[in-house]
Regions:
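Phosphate/pyrophosphate-binding loops at sites that engage ATP/ADP/AMP, CoA/4′-phosphopantetheine
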Residues: 47-61, 249-254
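Conserved beta-ketoacyl condensing-enzyme motif
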Residues: 57-80, 84
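Extreme N-terminal starter segment of soluble prokaryotic enzymes
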Residues: 1-4
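Flexible beta->alpha loop and helix N-cap segments adjacent to enzyme active/binding sites
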Residues: 9-36, 76-91, 97-100, 104-213, ...
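Glycine-rich phosphate-binding loops at beta-strand->alpha-helix junctions
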Residues: 60, 70-72, 255-272
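Active-site pocket-shaping loop/turn-to-helix segments
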Residues: 30-41, 236, 240
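Phosphate/ATP-binding catalytic cores across multiple sugar-kinase/actin-like superfamilies
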Residues: 236-256
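Short glycine/proline- and acidic residue-enriched helix-loop micro-motifs
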Residues: 221-237
């Protein structure tokens, strides 16, 4: 049976395909069409996911569509999909139901509490669920405008960043702030998770929803720019309050599953991991709206068709990959000089040598990642042993603020030597802590409070990248590499070889490995 899921159709469109219970493909549309936050049906992703799954449109038995979706009337959307998938049933999936299914059925748990929190997916901004076997039942709901996601976005805008796009910057800034504004935000967010409209109202048009009373308590004149010195403390007050509030919403249970855009906040995830209330915490790593495409197919397979579970998500490498002939054709078409490395050992040896020479490498291997994070298949790599590596990554390639630190990839069997991490570090969906004896080595990557974006790489998850890390460790004594997504500022993650070539020659990357092909400047 082939099920096709469509989610994020208001602006983070994505497609996923489940075939006979196995997740075969998942792709965000913007990684293929390079349009910022594409809405509507993700036609390119649909075609590519079906190709990767080895399925035709006539073989699709169900199209699972996650609400809400653009301004197209539901009847018209059904008509469009019936034209494209003539033999398929059209199933509608509620937004938070899709988030919940994506979290629970991707997890390894047979029973769990599930918490989904976002901006306002379907007028609900949050739901707590109880999940067991193949069923997920809602226990409690929160409705807009009492939205923690909306509040986080409003503070993001207040601090001079883009709501809906740069909340992660507020998260990172918060790591260096004090808690002087935490009491104020605890008044904004009541103990029942309702937002006090005398401080903040999502329906208020002026000042991003904040009231004169809020600015008076903040000690800043309404309508003026927030002083730079106050920004970290405001960010910290918000982050601390959100963490405490979410802890109160999450309820009890042995296992906790998380999804929804708020849980792209890795510091929040780490707080829940470390609080000690649950034995295990799992966050669906593509927690935002694109990830509802996963939830759509899981919902139909498990909750509608009542099919047994198969052990959760096994991989996020669900996008397209490219063979040697496809890569070579692009390189020759671009009239580039390149070297073909005949063995994997030779390729790894060359990469380790260059990293030891403090060069910055682009690394494009295998199938593209689904979700917002690079996990070693579409990555830019540098050695922590180069004291200027993070500075060079920023100056010559990423052009981003110094407070945005780079991830550190480490083999799973050696991770405990360098970092304290939880299981969600497998997908870069949490943060870790640097061991005291290694603070100096990773000083440039520490966010504050010894936090670091640790990426734990198991051999079974990514054998080639794992080998690279191990070989780098043997050569230098440090099996850790800084890892950031292979894309330029403002662009999505590279998908195809031509994307990689464009990014390579538009940046200060020193060398690029695309499959077994090596390009140097």
């Amino acid at each position: 049976m082939v099920i096709l899921g469509l989610g994020g159709l208001l602006g983070d469109a994505a497609c996923a395909v489940l075939k006979d219970g196995e997740l075969k493909a998942a792709i965000e549309e913007n990684k293929l069409d390079h349009v910022w936050r594409p809405g509507g049906l993700p036609q390119a992703s649909i075609a590519e996911c079906l190709r990767l799954a080895g399925a035709t449109r006539d073989e699709v038995e169900c199209v699972a569509l996650v609400r809400p979706f653009a301004r197209t009337p539901e009847s018209q959307m059904h008509s469009i999909l019936r034209d494209q998938f003539p033999k398929a049933e059209i199933a509608m999936v509620e937004h938070h139901q899709a988030h919940a299914a994506s979290a629970f059925f991707a997890s390894p748990f047979e029973e769990a509490t599930v918490l989904t929190l976002d901006h306002d997916g379907d007028f609900r901004c949050g739901t707590r669920w109880h999940a067991k076997d193949t069923q997920i039942q809602a226990e409690r709901e929160w409705y807009y405008p009492d939205s923690l996601g909306r509040l986080y976005g409003a503070v993001t805008q207040l601090l001079g960043y883009r709501a809906g796009a740069e909340e992660h910057k507020v998260q990172w800034i918060s790591a260096s702030g004090d808690e002087r504004y935490a009491p104020l935000f605890r008044e904004v967010v009541t103990t029942s998770a309702r937002l006090d409209p005398s401080f903040f109202d999502g329906h208020r048009q002026s000042e991003g929803g904040f009231s004169p009373k809020f600015f008076e308590r903040l000690g800043i004149e309404e309508g003026t720019r927030i002083p730079a010195a106050a920004v970290p403390a405001i960010a910290r007050g918000l982050q601390k309050t959100v963490e405490e509030t979410v802890l109160g919403l999450a309820g009890e249970g042995e296992n906790l599953c998380l999804a929804g855009g708020l849980f792209l906040n890795v510091m929040l995830v780490e707080f829940l991991e470390r609080c000690g209330r649950w034995k295990k915490v799992f966050v669906q790593p593509a927690a935002g709206n694109a990830g509802t495409a996963l939830g759509a197919v899981y919902h139909v397979w498990h909750q509608v068709r009542r099919q047994k579970r198969r052990g959760g998500m096994q991989s996020l490498f669900l996008g397209p990959g490219y063979g040697a002939e496809e890569i070579k054709q692009v390189l020759e078409n671009c009239k580039l000089r390149f070297q073909y490395l005949r063995s994997t050992d030779d390729m790894l040896a060359q990469a380790v040598r260059m990293l030891g020479e403090h060069k910055i490498l682009a690394w494009m291997q295998g199938r593209m990642e689904f979700g917002p994070r690079a996990l070693g298949n579409r990555s830019i790599l540098a050695s922590p042993l180069d004291p200027y590596s993070t500075e060079n990554l920023n100056v010559f390639i990423k052009h981003r603020e110094p407070f945005r630190k780079f991830a550190a990839s480490v083999p799973a069997e050696e991770a405990a030597e360098y970092f304290e991490t939880g299981p969600n570090a497998r997908y870069l969906a949490t943060v870790g802590r640097v061991r005291p004896q290694h603070r100096k080595t990773f000083e440039a990557a520490i966010l504050g409070q010894d936090m670091i974006r640790a990426h734990v790489v198991a051999e079974k998850d990514n054998p080639l990248y794992h080998r690279l890390l191990r070989k780098a460790g043997k050569a230098t004594g440090l099996p850790v590499l800084y890892n950031t997504s292979f894309n330029l500022f403002g662009d999505p993650l590279v998908s195809a070889p031509r994307d990689a070539v464009r990014s390579f020659y538009s940046s200060g990357i020193d060398a690029m490995f695309v499959g077994n092909f090596l390009l140097e400047k």
